[in-house]
Amino acid sequence: MSNNVVITGANRGIGLAMCMHFKAQGDKVFALCRNSSTDLEELNVNVIEGIDVASDIGVDNMVAALSNVDIDVLVCNAGILRDESLSQLNLDTIREQFEINALAPLRVVATLQANLNEGAKVALITSRMGSISDNTSGGRYGYRMSKAALNAAAMSLSHDLASKKIAVGIYHPGYVQTEMVNYGGDISASDSAKKLVGLINQLTQDQSGVFKHSNGSVLPW
């Protein structure tokens, strides 16, 4: 059975690769992004440009484009990484990461909740860097704090959407070879996306609100 799958941040990296894997299994993919890419256009999915999930106009564009779409799977993947240290704090980049990594996914889910079918799935692409107990190296203040906030929002969503039997998956993709980390990761975007799509396929109500690595292991908060 084909699902309607909506993915944010879909023009490159993990988002692009997830579009590819969902399409390969027969799903109808709606790829949301600010600007498309050649690689995304070649996938022959439904590309919706002009979607900046951190802006009012971008969210309005999203609502208009998806007004008649019943969503089975919603993947909030858009995110950014900036670098701050204790000696070089930049409150502007910390705020920017909160807007895009934490507030925007929550806003996307809240705005599209009327489009979500009963029994739908919401996947939030987070990071183990948002784990408090797993933080053994410090630094990366904005990224760590914003992903911890996303994890907290995801847990609340898992409770608030339960009445519609909507399951919420909270996923760390791994250290992925993407532009965000200058391609210095240890797993390709395609391999990570394949694992994530597999986890989303298997997501059930009893696993809602569980923080998982793309390899399937449960991560600590």
Task: List each model region and its residues.
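Structural signature of the Rossmann-like NAD(P)-dependent dehydrogenase/reductase core
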Residues: I7-T8, C76-N77, K121-S127, A167-H172
